[in-house]
Amino acid sequence: MRTTYRLIVAALGLASFIVSTATVQAQFIYVTNNGTITIIFCMPSGGAVAIPSTINGLLVTGIGDGAFDHCTDLTSVTIPDSVNSIGNEAFYDLPRLTNVTIGDSVTSIGTNAFAYCSSLISVTIPDSVTSIGDYAFASCWMVTSVTIGLGVTSIGQGVFNSCRSLTSVLMPNNVTSIGYGAFANCSSLANVTIPNSVTSIGYGAFSGCGLTNVTIPNSVTSIGDDAFASSGLTSVTIGSGVTSIGEGVFEECTSLTNIVVTLLNPAYSSADGVLFDKSQTTLVQCPGGKAGNYAIPNGVTSIRDDAFYDC
């Protein structure tokens, strides 16, 4: 049975004081725009759901904000190739969701789209995706692997924050920036390869991770405050392109014993595993796990705040 009617979307918990023309078809409520369909509500359901590519002959191209966020018994969802956008909080906080298949036409994934899907096991983002909203997969505690498609150039704020079972991340060489807290508190993430395309690593991007060693490629020019703070690092290699290193980048890395800067770097250098500016007049960071006594070189005229924090 198909019913078209005017409804106050707030009555369905979709938004406040928004009036829209919507259509009910089986388990979905949707709106039509320019001959295509956006699903704005799914009747509460459990188990596996395959979103149709067409409804009544019209392509389903969008999943609206919060469309499935009440389907707490949902275990699996398949998003068809017809869909090009997944809205904010579209699948937010679905504790039983273990599997998501994202269609090959999706270009944007909204803020918090899959956040707190605490049983989700893996994430594969297709090459078609060019935009991932902040915290899109944050606190997906059981996710062990993430594959990011070729279309993504920026990993935004907190996208995989607190994915504490995450052990494997595959980033393409198209990524140029890793944002604020993007992988923060991924405590099982012991190894990561930062692509040669990355130019900036944001504030706290890998803070609280289980990383044991990291090589910062020559393409990177800036590393934000606390980028690797409180991680499990034992060694770090900084490439030739880095010209800006924020405060506390390696703060509370109590296992870190050695920081190495590539000789060709124009702004920074290292000696005896300690990070300095190029002229070695400013001591930037003493690794927190450095053992024994350390004598500050005679030429040092300034020491950065927290340079010896937690040593």
Residue ranges and their predicted role:
Residues 38-40:
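Extracellular adhesion/carbohydrate-recognition regions
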Residues 9-20:
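Bacterial N-terminal signal peptides
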Residues 64:
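N-terminal cofactor/phosphate-binding cores enriched in small/glycine residues
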Residues 22-28:
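Boundary at the C-terminal end of the N-terminal hydrophobic targeting segment
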Residues 29-34, 45-61, 72-85, 94-108, ...:
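Structural signature of tandem-repeat unit edges
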Residues 1-7:
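Positively charged n-region of N-terminal signal peptides that target proteins for export
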